[in-house]
Amino acid sequence: MNSDTNAFKDIRISCVELSRIAFLPTESFDPNSLTLLACLKKVEEKLSAYEDDSLSPKFADYVFVPIASLLKQPALGESQTEYVLLIIFHLLRTCWSSNGKFSEQLGQQLFPLITFLVSSDKDNQKLITRSDEFKYAGCLVLHQFFKSVRSQRYHKEFFSNSKPNLLPALGHSVTILLKILEQSPQNNELQFKALASLEVLFQDIISDGEMLSFILPGNVSVFAKILTKPGRQIHYKVCVRTLEVLAKLLVLVYDDFSLDIKVNKLTDIRELSDTKLKHEINQSFMFNGPIVLLRTDGKTHRDTSWLTATSGQINIALEAFIPKLLKRNNESIDEALATFVSILLTRCENSLNNCEKVLVSTLVHLERDPMSKLPSHLVKLKEVVNEDLHKLSDIIRFENADRLSSLSFAITILEKNNERDTMINEVVRCLFESLNESIEPPSLINHKERIIEQSSQLTTTVNFENLESTNALIALPRLSEDMSLKLKKFTYHMGSLLLERHILNDVVTELISEQVDSPRTQKIVALWLSTNFIKAMEKQPKEEEVYLQFESDANYSSSMVEEVCLIVLEFCNELSQDISMEIEGKGIKKSDEFAVCTVLFSIETICAVMREEFQPELIDYIYTVVDALASPSEAIRYVSQSCALRIADTLYHGSIPNMILSNVDYLVESISSRLNSGMTERVSQILMVICQLAGYETIENFKDVIETIFKLLDYYHGYSDLCLQFFQLFKIIILEMKKKYINDDEMILKIANQHISQSTFSPWGMTDFQQVLNILDKETQVKDDITDENDVDFLKDDNEPSNFQEYFDSKLREPDSDDDEEEREEEVEGSSKEYTDQWTSPIPSDSYKILLQILGYGERLLTHPSKRLRVQILIVMRLIFPLLSTQHNLLIREVASTWDSIIQCVLCSDYSIVQPACSCVEQMIKYSGDFVAKRFIELWQKLCQDSFILKELRIDPTVHNHEKKSISKHVKFPPVTENALVSMVHMVLEGVKITEYLISEAVLEQIIYCCIQVVPVEKISSMSLIVGDIVWKIRNIN
């Protein structure tokens, strides 16, 4: 009471002011009066401050007096009506909300009034034009009215058939809320309040399916419209709330228990003679499907005819909005939809029997079954699976990955409930056929662009460190990686089902055996499927599961694994040989790429499954794996790396080199047989990969193969591509040989320095002052004894000169390039015997001989018209000379024999050849020392007369306008020219180191002048004192 008193005192003045306007005569009353609006706002503001159920009904009676007077006026403005509705809402909230405070009579009087104030016309046309604030006020008052009625004891009978006078207002209120829900897509709060009002009305007040059945169609229609709208128009939370309200409405109307439904199934054709059944059979039902009968008294609205008609409408509505909701791919919507469907399958299983398919299909597509309802609907689930299987080709072609995942989910449910006897075999058949249809036929692939051979740097570089993991994904032709991954997971799951049923062996054997005369594409698909089936065996049983295995099961499993793996391996071997023969000399097509990747994937999987038992089988497949490592296809290389790592991890403790070395004999045999059969393509790349992976040790096992390659160079030296591949291989061999026998370049220089004079003051091979004294002593002794002809000559070495001139002349008489080819071959053959006692090179004589052979064939092919081949040969020669310098006696012979051929390349007009040729000559000068001093002097003369590259520079140091800055480059050269000039300058400067005291100052000045136009002056002037003086002279005197 105290609250009422305080509230009365607080609101009395506002009510008085409102009454003054409300009780005005009709002719004086202004329905749109702003004063009236202000008074209503004051009252509403006062009421909004009071807590729920804090005041008595008497207080409401007092406040309602001016409101009742207002309602007697002929009209009321929109804003004024809005605040009247808000005032009624507050009165319901504060005074009429709890049990016993809101009389049934008052409710019956107030409800029609509220619905009229919200919408005065039955069609709600005016309501559409109202503001959202007005609509919200209407929803608020209706929601609060329903809540207040719910709190009263009479709430169950408030809208009963015994009180028909309220039914029109009830129908009107429902249409108002549905109209607001449908027409306010941008106002979520308004929609939530409308849905909350309907929920209270349906579930807590009416809760009578019979009565709700009258208003069901309109509700379902509006709800379906809401749920079918796109996401940009309807918030996902509104969809979730709508599904909740719709589920409650459908359960109230179609609940199997309340309808007292009895389900009969036809078991005998004679049952059709039953009169009742004749009447109930409807064409929309399957002939052998369930026929629903209702026990009715003839007075109820919900009879069989009603059920047949309305359930069909419900099915149409479900088929309309469920696919739209699925496409939104929203987690909250998916969860609400799964709950919605599960509730209908639980409470309305029989009454909405015709909706069973769409409901089951929804759970399958959602891959959710929160109430575990699918096991009780296996027949319909199987129909859904069969339909998806028949559409599997389209699912794959259009890359509907989600549909494939849901199919796997459905098959799992069937498998868990012993409904897989024929289903799993049907799945395998459809999967095989669908993949074949989805992958492009070979006739269309043949005209596709072939995979272009990449540079040797790419195709022969195998980087296992960058491989994130094994089990590389094989993308199916014409399908994305995502879809390929989904298919792989799907197939793997089917394999696990086959394994559980112990029929994996039979299915794989049958699948492969049927492909004997099939096109290669089908064979590859069969192999891809079989391998993914077998991959299920790779999963090891958990430790606790091992104890549950019976011995017979374990033995069967072991024998089954080995048998099916061997079948797949044999199939891989046949396919691999066919592919190798087909692509030899033709290049790899995209279809070949997928085929090779699948074979490698199969080998990797079998290795993972068989583990140590795969060791005896490896010899037949190691060449296939290594061959793929050298493939021009990046995809094939990636998969082969994954396969090689798997084999190494399983059998060789993760060591790729050990894997290669342990099987090198089989690799030699495979490569030799291919060479002998004329299959020369890519042999060099394979050897490169082997050498890179396992080091030079493998080449020692490939000596016969290397000899065969040398013979092929004799026979096929006109084929530039083949020769180029061989010299790319030679480069790898040389690098690996250096890696094994030579620690670093300093080691080579240390060995070479024993024979090379590095001091400019000892050009005749003398390295210290004592050698000078010894020479002088011997010459003096000869002069003292020259008159005594009977004296015995002084003891000296036969090979040691008696004076400077003889020593210098002996150097010039050493072997040079006039030696013919036959002498070279004899020297190569006899080198190991002749120098056995004095062999100083860390490189064994057999390996050294390989270097000499490579050098000899390279010199011969330097006249080949192919520019790429000549460049590659020069690159290889540049690598050879430092290694040859470790045995100086043989180095000088090779320098002498190859000098002229390489100099011809230096004088070439093609600068891309000049650059490696100059680098090669630089190495020859560096490691031969004063042996090539005379040749270098002659070379400079040739350069001045015949060189094209030297013409890019100014040779005469006296013509530069006496400007220091003119010494630098007078033109900006293209990259090719620039590289060639730099290489030539380095070559010339290396020659200057051994000839600066043998050539005239004018020539030396000419050489230095050319060099400082290309490389920094500081680098040249720091070479020696003489060179520094020449640089100073050029810059300051000329």
From Swiss-Prot:
InterPro entries: ARM-type_fold, TELO2-interacting_protein_1, Tti1, TTI1_rpt. The modification Phosphoserine is found at S817. This is TEL2-interacting protein 1. Residues 810-840 are annotated as: Disordered. The keyword Signal does not apply. The gene is TTI1. Present with 721 molecules/cell in log phase SD medium. Residues 816-829 have a biased composition (Acidic residues). Belongs to the tti1 family. GO terms for biological process: chromatin organization; positive regulation of DNA damage checkpoint; protein stabilization. One of its GO terms (cellular component) is nucleus. It comes from Saccharomyces cerevisiae (strain ATCC 204508 / S288c). It is found in: Cytoplasm; Nucleus. Component of the ASTRA chromatin remodeling machinery complex composed of at least RVB1, RVB2, TRA1, TEL2, TT1 and TTI2. Component of the TTT complex composed of TEL2, TTI1 and TTI2. Interacts with TEL2 and TTI2. The keyword Ribosomal protein does not apply. SUPFAM superfamilies: ARM repeat (SSF48371). Signal peptide: none annotated. Component of the ASTRA complex involved in chromatin remodeling.
